[in-house]
Regions:
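Cofactor-binding loop segments of dinucleotide-utilizing enzymes, especially the Rossmann-like FAD-
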Residues: 8, 39, 138-141, 170
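A short beta-strand-loop structural module common to alpha/beta enzyme folds
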Residues: 33-42, 167-171
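Active-site oxyanion/phosphate-handling segment shared across diverse enzymes
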Residues: 140-192
Length: 227
């Protein structure tokens, strides 16, 4: 099994989100091939909106930068994990640029509305891409994930199709840098490792496991931990 981690945090290895991602991967079999790409250390230019990947050079982006190598890594992976903190209700800029540059994987929009809400807005160019699994692991500083993630999840629904990706949403991200929160942090990461083992076996998470992957601490306790 090959796993590609696209680390979209500008903190690179110091990313709090990456700690969760590594805990998730700890649940995978020992022989899993894991490759990590720190996007902020790569030369990834923004999409030009030229649509050459849909017309003049179908399936091929005309921009020659590090995305050409990332395309090949995505094609070779069985599972792609996007790991990033929530920035202004969405992806950090380098993660968004990478997402924009994945347009060559999609077929052109031909003016037909998608009736199936579980389908992506654009059809994938290569049928083999349907066999891959996408996992999105993301943190935010707010105490509740519900008001923070609707915009991001709607975008992912349109890109990948509702139910065609696995999202692990982690609010209260500041607990990962609070000295007093070690016990809560370790307990949460243990749950994430168990979730990783389940995903590695089933390529999906049960609804119960999704709930356990959320960290919620009461307001008085949270204030004590971060003070």
């Amino acid at each position: 099994m090959k796993v590609l981690v696209l680390n979209g945090s500008p903190k690179a290895e110091r990313s709090n989100t990456l700690n969760i991602t590594k805990a998730f991967l700890k649940g995978f079999p020992a022989d899993t091939e894991v490759e990590q790409v720190n996007l902020y250390k790569k030369d990834i230019k923004p999409c030009l909106g030229c649509f050459s990947c849909w017309s003049r050079t179908p399936g091929q982006c005309v921009i020659k930068d590090d995305m050409q190598d990332i395309y090949e890594k995505i094609k070779a992976a069985d599972i792609v994990i996007e790991s990033f903190p929530l920035y202004f209700f969405g992806m950090p800029s380098q993660m968004k640029a990478t997402t924009d540059r994945c347009l060559p994987f999609m077929l052109p929009y031909m003016g037909n509305l998608v009736e199936d809400k579980n389908a992506s807005f654009h059809e994938l160019r290569d049928e083999s891409m349907h066999e891959k699994r996408l996992v999105v692991i993301t943190t935010c500083g707010y105490v509740d994930e519900k008001p923070m993630y609707p915009a991001l999840l709607k975008q992912l629904d349109l890109i990948a199709g509702e139910g065609h990706y696995t999202a692990i949403l982690c609010p209260e991200g500041e607990l990962f840098i609070a000295d007093k929160a070690k016990r809560q942090r370790e307990g949460y990461l243990a749950e994430i490792t168990r979730a990783g083992a389940e995903f590695a076996q089933n390529r999906a998470l049960s609804e119960e496991t999704k709930k356990l992957s959320l960290i919620h601490i009461s307001e008085p306790t949270r204030l004590q931990l971060i003070s």
